[in-house]
Amino acid sequence: MKYNVGEIRYEKGVSLRKLAQQARVSKSYLQKIEAGEAKPSLEIMVRLAQVLDRPLDQLYQVE
């Protein structure tokens, strides 16, 4: 599964550190999500969607 978190974060002009803090995840874990090296829980994806002000489905990339 791939995620659009990094692209959306970049578009919104939000730093990795700020998004990690607001979504209550570690910066290193967020980096792994963006790199496709981690499979975040639905709860974490919901928090990321809320912070990024995007619908949850936009955070997932269909392959």
Kindly label every feature range from the protein language model.
Residues 13-32:
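Short alpha-helical DNA-recognition segment
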Residues 4, 32-35, 47:
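Alpha-helical transmission elements in cytosolic ATPase-linked domains
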